[in-house]
UniProtKB/Swiss-Prot annotation:
The keyword Oxidoreductase does not apply. The keyword Chaperone does not apply. This is Large ribosomal subunit protein uL29. Belongs to the universal ribosomal protein uL29 family. InterPro entries: Ribosomal_protein_uL29, Ribosomal_uL29, Ribosomal_uL29_CS, Ribosomal_uL29_sf. Keywords: Ribonucleoprotein, Ribosomal protein. One of its GO terms (biological process) is translation.
Length: 64
């Protein structure tokens, strides 16, 4: 997800997106631990998406 798309969302939508990404990250970590994950680059993508969402949330909080 691009940062420009995240800037257009409100804080509630960003929190939901963050929650979904954290659940996805947990699932991927479990798959990695049980050696079921074949595409390990998904972990990196999800981790970076989480960082993007948290950055936008912080920016919105500091604007107020």
């Amino acid at each position: 997800m691009k940062a420009s798309e995240l800037h257009q969302k409100d804080q509630a939508a960003l929190n939901k997106e963050l929650s979904d990404l954290l659940k996805a990250q947990f699932g991927l970590r479990m798959q990695l631990a049980t050696q079921q994950l074949t595409n390990t680059s998904q972990l990196k993508k999800v981790r970076r998406d989480i960082a993007r969402v948290r950055t936008v949330l912080t920016e919105k909080a500091n604007q107020k």
